[in-house]
From Swiss-Prot:
This is DNA-directed RNA polymerase subunit beta. The RNAP catalytic core consists of 2 alpha, 1 beta, 1 beta' and 1 omega subunit. When a sigma factor is associated with the core the holoenzyme is formed, which can initiate transcription. One of its GO terms (molecular function) is DNA-directed RNA polymerase activity. GO terms for cellular component: DNA-directed RNA polymerase complex. Disulfide bonds: none annotated.
Length: 1342
């Protein structure tokens, strides 16, 4: 296996046994690919902006004299880059410019003669851009657009499962769902009539739709029924016999032909009878005349002589009618064939309840239902019906919809057609009737072949189209308004509706969410989330159990584990590790192809629909060397059912064991030993882990950690290979390898690192270089670690030495006992950065001012502010301190003469402004790390703003100059190489000024051209540098575009250091969560025979009932890993030679049956030394999910580390020194600190604000509210008979306004008496009763 440069520094021992056929695909591709499709120009016009434009344009005027045509579009360059957008609070977007052509036709000339053509580029608003990490920056905050799982367009056949009608009869229905347009439903009622609904409105008999399509009764009957022919032959009645139709009937007369009686009267017709009739070729039998009575005629029978209708189509035949028919000479009669078994008379019955007689009456009926109250006209009715399903503007099935529709009704023409036609409607009705007759199956709505993914690109395109349609109406009107000679396309288009639609979608759609940025994993999982909620999706209340449940087709597509607990369970899912979307938006998952019983490395992606046809083996099926299956019978899946299949029948095999689960779930080692409910909590809690101060890789991982860290985009990854030229805290410079150069560039890559910035969740984002100058790197290598990454691996928590034992009740009910050492070593210390904003506005009474001159504030409170009234960087502040001084003018009050006199003498001061400074919130204390001042264009900048500006300019200049010098150096080195090969000596060049090298001449023409090219590049580089600096300077110095009425914004960034403390929530990766109950001194913690104390004590009772045994295995394996580290440390202490180390390491990496081949011999001495250095803390281990380390391997590793194979040690009590009576499981578990910190939750109130109506204290920390003393608490005091306490609770402590004011005064005076009065809420109750017209008065006790 080839290890990349960073991987060699610390090789994970892999316990996986299955070979890796397929690497995990790029994790964010679902977002990036979808958006690229939307943005990039598609010549076919199938997707994205192009499709939206083509669907709306050309726009014709109402009178047809002119039209506006679409030519092409282009996207400009963004004004600010991503970081600048975040700082300034603006949207990262590109301007959209569209080339339009206005064509004016000549009214007087024949149609289509062009009078004038004008072309122009029109600005059509801004299109937000996706960053490289799959997010959008909207108004300065990073947001994610979650993909939506919605019902695919097409036709669905379903039943109510007998729930609608009391009889329990199953009613079938069919629904045609377009991508946009009206829904068309067909449904049976309990009487077996077939009805139709349009857009879920009132139902009409379904034959109305057929009549509206111009069908007569005869044609309708002809389409839906088989016929039976009767012939009248001299007083007898002969019936045409199709033997198959007799199945299951009881003969009402002797069935005989040619003198043979086949079935006697009253006998049931069996299959044997039918075979006999078929064999003898009986095609006509004589029937009694009564047999035809009650049968339904299939067409009109007319008396030729009089012209009267004897029997109409769909009318029952009676004896009189029969007599009339034979009189009129109708010898051949055609009736409908129906029976109760599989040819129901549904359409015939429906025709009887249908009141319409012809096309017009049917159209009018439909019009009345769609537009009740409007008088129908023939034209309006026709136009409405036409536009409902047959017009491309109003109705579109989309490619997906048409594909699903055709496959459902078995049509193979009309592949491109987006609208419905007559055939479609009739075929759907036929299929529905067939299902009612017992042929065919209803669809499963939760099957992933019937639900598709709508990603960012598609949703943005839909919103964009909505905006365009709004514009279209306005354009049509303007085109019809007379004189077009002076009009240009720009005058017709108003970009506001378009940008409003797009802005609304990105800013406030239910699926545009504030990115979860706790740690790299939470970012990745948020972008891979699939939601069934949102516009056009389900709602929480309506979603039943079936939709939320795991479906067999989720296998390898959606994760069965990772979903939120609570009301959204099952509605919000996560993409499985290898899943991807196909062109139609259906989820696919990869499988290895099996050819003639041999498993190949060829991989096919199958969607849920395709998968149903194959037999698929599991990833852990045993294989022989040659790729054939080892066992005769193999566990495999077919149509979602798991079972044993002979190996010859297998078509495919899973690619990997973690194919089923999502990324978060595949980060849980030994997932296979955990109960699913706990695994769900484990997967969800990893996303809440706060990045610790020092990231530490997990000793026991699953091998996916590197993928997450690299794909999440928090690390800095080499774009091209090369040698590290220089490294400092803020930038890394790489000299690119010769073979990866683009001709004519300097060959230097510069990576600027992010330092101490705030994430959406107020955690700290900081990148630290993990390479040294002179090191070689390859493309894709990690150069710098971000938050929660360690040497390019995801590191959400810390490896803690834990013991499973009770300890004095401090770990009762999932509490956690932590050693003081953990706090001292800052293992779980986290940094949180808060942004506090102060806005100075223009008010009616004058503008607010940011100043250090604040009325009635002492000197001490201003000590941390500079002269501009803004706090300086580095100040340590606590709750209540002023950060930005601000005063607001307040309204003139009427002054008394005395005050006027005083003001006249002492001048105006303080009376006309009030203090509205920005203060530190109460429970917060920390250090100021950054201040930013934004000033409106045209407002004078204060001193602090100018200082910041100067500093930024200096930084920008320094950065760009360094960058230029690096690039210049690279270029001049190449010049030097050319000159040296052209005959100049090293000494000569060293004495010449480097800039002059470019002016030297060479004999060799080829070299001279090369030199000239380099000189040209040098000039370009310089010009580029000047241009870059000018742009930077302009951006820094120009005024900011602030919201209307805002003059200045000051943003202050406050860093808070949070150590771990009792009340903080911690968790392992197996759903084992708990709250810290006590921080115990190290000397009191249990310790082992070597005197090493444990860090954390967990309760063993938390394991058996929760069935997450994975944590025990993790602890054992962690202990073994640490044992190997200790062994290496011992060898280092003994200063053994390198060969011994190589031998030991080889032994460790070869242990157990594993797919991993590590050849220590191929590493250089330096590399081995680095590896040893990184393994001293313990051997990192990968145990992939469902393919993890076996019990035997763990024991072997424990043995190699010199530890007991049971994984249990004798521990001694730290307080007494006595040994505990039985060995205790001790080991290393990876623990996370979750973002539920006690500091953010702890809250107490003395007095504060009250609710307006009830006058009771508000609730919640944000409102500085009180604790609710509810109904049950009142019962408790009543039960104790604590009458006075209860009275106090319900009056002065709550809503007795006078009482509480008095009480406050009394306490101030040192008198602790209380006088309870009438609670305000009681008055509210009285008012409410009076509002009902009941007079209620309070009487004093006499």
């Amino acid at each position: 296996m080839v290890y990349s440069y960073t991987e060699k520094k610390r090789i994970r021992k892999d316990f996986g046994t299955r070979p890796q056929v397929l690497d995990i695909p790029y994790l964010l591709s679902i977002q990036l690919d979808s958006f690229d499709k939307f943005i990039e120009q598609d010549p076919e016009g199938q997707y994205g902006l192009e499709a939206a434009f083509r669907s709306v344009f050309p726009i014709q005027s109402y009178n047809g004299n002119s039209e506006l045509q679409y030519v092409s579009y282009r996207l400009g360059e963004p004004v600010f880059d991503v970081k600048e957008c975040q700082i300034r609070g603006v949207t990262y977007s590109k301007p959209l410019r569209v080339k339009l052509r206005l064509v004016i036709f000549d009214k007087d000339a024949p149609a289509g003669t062009v009078k004038d053509i004008k072309e122009q580029e029109v600005y059509m608003g801004e299109i937000p851009l996706m960053t490289d990490n799959g997010t959008f920056v909207i108004n300065g905050t990073e947001r994610v657009i979650v993909s939506q799982l919605h019902r695919s367009p097409g036709v669905f056949f379903d039943s109510d499962k007998g729930k609608t009608h009391s009889s329990g009869k199953v009613l079938y229905n069919a629904r045609i769902i377009p991508y946009r347009g009206s829904w068309l439903d067909f449904e049976f009622d309990p009487k077996d009539n077939l009805y139709v609904r349009i857009d879920r409105r009132r139902k009409l008999p379904s034959t109305i739709i057929l009549r509206a399509l111009g069908k007569s009764t005869e044609e309708i009957l002809d389409t839906f029924f088989e016929k039976v022919n009767f012939e009248v032959k001299d007083q007898t009645l002969m019936m045409e016999l199709v033997p198959d139709r007799l199945r299951g009937e009881t003969a009402t007369f002797d069935i005989e032909a040619n003198g043979t009686v086949y079935v006697e009267k009253g006998r049931r017709v069996t299959a044997r009878h039918i075979r006999q009739l078929e064999k003898e070729g009986v095609d006509q039998i004589e029937v009694p005349v009564e047999y035809i009575v009650g049968k339904v005629s299939s067409k009109d029978y007319i008396n030729e002589a009089t012209g009267e209708i004897i029997v109409a189509a769909n009318q029952e035949i009676s004896l009189e009618a029969l007599a009339k028919l034979s009189q009129a000479g109708h010898k051949q009669l055609e009736v409908l064939f129906t029976n109760d078994l599989d040819h129901g008379p549904f359409m015939s019955e429906t025709l009887r309840i249908d009141s319409s007689v012809d096309r017009i009456s049917a159209l009018v009926e439909i019009y009345r239902m769609m537009r009740p109250g409007e008088p129908p006209t023939k034209e309006a009715a026709e136009a409405l019906f036409e536009s409902l399903f047959f017009s491309e503007e109003r109705y579109d099935l989309s490619t997906v919809g048409r594909m699903k529709f055709n496959s459902s009704i078995g049509r193979d023409d009309a592949e491109e057609q987006g609208t419905l036609d007559e055939t479609d409607i009739i075929e759907v009705m036929k299929k529905l009737i067939a299902i009612r007759n017992g042929k065919g199956e209803v669809d499963d709505i939760d099957h992933l072949g019937n639900r598709r993914i709508r990603s960012v690109g598609e949703m943005a395109e839909n919103q964009f189209r909505v905006g365009l349609v709004r514009v279209e109406r306005a354009v049509k009107e303007r085109l019809s308004l007379g004189d077009l000679d002076a009009v240009m396309p720009q005058d017709l288009i108003n970009a506001k509706p378009i940008s409003a639609a797009v802005k609304e979608f990105f800013g406030s759609s239910q699926l545009s969410q504030f990115m979860d940025q706790n740690n790299p994993l939470s970012e990745v999982t948020h972008k891979r989330r699939i939601s069934a909620l949102g516009p056009g999706g389900l709602t929480r209340e309506r979603a039943g159990f079936e939709v939320r449940d795991v479906h067999v087709t989720h296998y390898g597509r959606l994760c069965p584990i990772e979903t939120p607990e609570g009301p959204n369970i099952g509605l919000i899912n996560s993409l499985s590790a290898f899943a991807r979307c196909n062109e139609y938006g259906f989820l696919e998952t990869p499988y290895r192809r099996v050819v003639d019983g041999v498993v190949t490395d060829e991989v096919d992606y199958l969607s849920a629909i395709e998968e149903g046809q194959f037999v698929i083996a599991q990833a852990n099926a045993k294989l022989n060397e040659d790729g054939t299956f080892a066992d005769e019978l193999i566990t495999a899946r077919q149509k979602g059912e798991s079972g044993l299949h002979p190996r010859e029948h297998v078509d495919y095999m899973d690619v990997a064991t973690n194919q089923v689960v999502s990324i978060a779930a595949s980060l849980i080692p030994f997932l296979e030993h955990d109960d699913a409910n706990r695994a769900l909590m484990g997967a969800n809690m990893q996303r809440q882990a706060v990045p610790t101060l020092k990231a530490e890789k997990p000793l026991v991982g699953t091998g996916i950690e590197r993928n997450v860290a690299v794909d999440s985009g928090v690390t800095s990854v080499a774009k091209r290979g090369g040698i590290i030229q220089s490294v400092d805290a803020s930038r890394i410079v790489v000299k690119v390898n010769e073979e990866e150069l683009i001709p004519g560039e300097a060959g230097i890559d510069i990576y600027n690192l992010t330092k101490y910035t705030r994430s959406n969740q107020n955690t700290c984002i900081n990148q630290r270089p993990c390479v040294m100058p002179g090191e070689p790197v390859l493309r894709g290598d990690v150069l710098a670690d971000g938050p929660s990454t360690d040497l390019g691996e995801l590191a959400l928590g810390q490896n803690m030495r834990i013991a499973f034992m009770p300890w004095n009740g401090y770990n009762f009910e999932d509490s956690i006992l932590v050693s003081e050492r953990v706090v001292q070593e800052d293992r779980f210390t986290t940094i949180h950065i808060q942004e506090l904003t102060c806005v100075a506005r223009d008010t009616k009474l004058g503008s607010e001012e940011i100043t250090a001159d604040i009325p009635n504030v002492g000197e001490s409170a201003l000590s941390k502010l500079d002269e501009s009234g803004i706090v300086y960087i580095g100040a340590e502040v606590k709750g209540g301190d002023i950060l930005v001084g601000k005063v607001t003018p307040k309204g003139e009050t009427q002054l008394t003469p005395e005050e006027k006199l005083l003001r006249a003498i002492f001048g105006e001061k303080a009376s006309d402004v009030k203090d509205t400074s920005l203060r530190v919130p109460n429970s917060v204390s920390g250090t100021i790390i950054d201040v930013q001042v934004f000033t409106r264009d045209g407002v004078e900048k204060d001193k602090r703003a100018l200082e910041i500006e100067q500093m930024q300019l200096k930084e920008a200049k320094k950065d760009l100059t360094e960058e230029f010098q690096i690039l210049e150096g690279g270029l001049l080195n190449r010049v030097k190489a050319v000159l040296l090969s052209g005959g100049y000596s090293e000494a000569k060049l060293d004495t010449t000024d480097r800039k002059k090298w470019l002016e030297l001449t060479l004999e060799d023409d080829a070299l001279q051209t090369q030199l000239e090219q380099l000189a040209e590049q040098y000039d370009e580089l310089k010009a580029d540098f000047d241009k870059k600096f000018e742009t930077k300077r302009r951006k820094i110095t120009q005024g900011d575009d602030l919201a209307p009425g805002v003059l200045k914004i000051v943003k202050v960034y406050l860093a808070v250091k949070r150590r771990i403390q009792p009340g903080d929530k911690m968790a392992g990766r197996h759903g084992n969560k708990g709250v810290i109950s006590k921080i115990n001194p190290v000397e009191d913690m249990p310790y082992d025979e070597k005197g090493q104390p444990v860090d954390i004590v967990l309760n063993p009772l938390g394991v058996p009932s929760r069935m997450n045994i994975g944590q025990i295995l993790e602890v054992h394996l962690g202990l073994a890993a640490k044992g190997i580290g200790d062994k290496i440390n011992q060898m280092v202490k003994e200063q053994q030679e390198l060969a011994k180390f190589r031998e030991f390491l080889q032994k460790v990496y070869d242990l157990g049956e594993t797919r991993q081949k590590v050849d220590i011999a191929s590493l250089s001495d330096e590399e081995v030394r680095t590896l040893i250095g990184n393994l001293r803390g313990g051997l990192p281990i990968a145990t992939p999910v469902f393919d993890g380390a076996s019990e035997a391997s763990i024991k072997e590793l424990l043995k190699l580390g010199g530890l007991p194979e049971s994984g249990q040690l004798t521990l001694f009590d730290g307080r007494t020194g006595d040994a505990f009576e039985r060995p205790v499981t001790v080991g290393y578990m990876y623990m996370l600190k979750l973002n539920h910190l006690v500091d953010d939750k702890m809250h107490a109130r003395s007095t504060g604000s009250y609710s307006l109506v009830t006058q009771q204290p508000l609730g919640g920390k944000a409102q500085f509210g009180g604790q609710r003393f509810g109904e049950m608490e009142v019962w408790a005091l009543e039960a104790y008979g604590a009458a006075y306490t209860l009275q106090e609770m319900l009056t002065v402590k709550s809503d007795d306004v006078n009482g509480r004011t008095k009480m406050y005064k009394n306490i101030v005076d040192g008198n602790h008496a209380m006088e309870p009065g009438m609670p305000e809420s009681f008055n509210v109750l009285l008012k409410e009763i009076r509002s009902l017209g009941i007079n209620i008065e309070l009487e004093d006790e006499q």
